[in-house]
Amino acid sequence: MNPDKFLEQQKYYEAARGFLHKFQTNSGKIHKDDAGAPLGPDELRDLGLAISSCTMETRSVHKSNVKSFWSQLVSIVEPYKTDLSMLPEFELYPYIVDSFSKNKLIKPSNNSWQRLSGPPRVHLGEVVSAITQTLKCETAEVRSAMLVHNIVAASTYYQNIYLDSLAALLDVAPRDAERAVAKLIIDKTIDATIDKLAADPTGGVSCLIAFSGATTDDNFNDSLFRLCKEVSNCVEAAQSK
């Protein structure tokens, strides 16, 4: 392995270990799992917050290395995987990062998202029930952040697309898609134009959106960070109840 690449991976590995150590130090209870006993609701809550903190750290990690960071983290917490699988965000964040690293749109129909609004697979007390009830509504902030991320992702591999087609791709109403694209243009998050005089394939009048393809890694990173942050806020609010 290239020495520089090894040092880079080691850096993310140590960062991930640091977050887990913070949880172990603050809780002092995670070691009981060594004897095979499952983590209780309080431990799950604390570990969930540690996982959320790890996600925040990805903002400072270059896009090409985000997935490596997460794979290191997941390998470190492997002994607690059975307990962590009860936390919706543990399944969701790797899916978000995987989609992000491959420039794919994040689909609300993905099983990881569906589990956010489904019943807990194992009853773990009021903490997990509170998480499920809070996330069931899918907050406006999470929906908005997902929409922004998906538009930024779409701008990286579309040059021209009709508004109706983009809306279908994003799974939102055309009016919402147009409003979101316009805001991102004004904010300079994406470089695009909206042509309201373009004729669509059916002969009607529609909007044609032209992307320049100049989306930066920083903008792409920021869109992922915002989405993870909103999901973390939602989960943390539920866990604090």
Regions found by a protein language model. Give the residues of each.
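Charged, E/D/K/R/S-rich low-complexity terminal regions of large eukaryotic assembly subunits
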Residues: 1-241
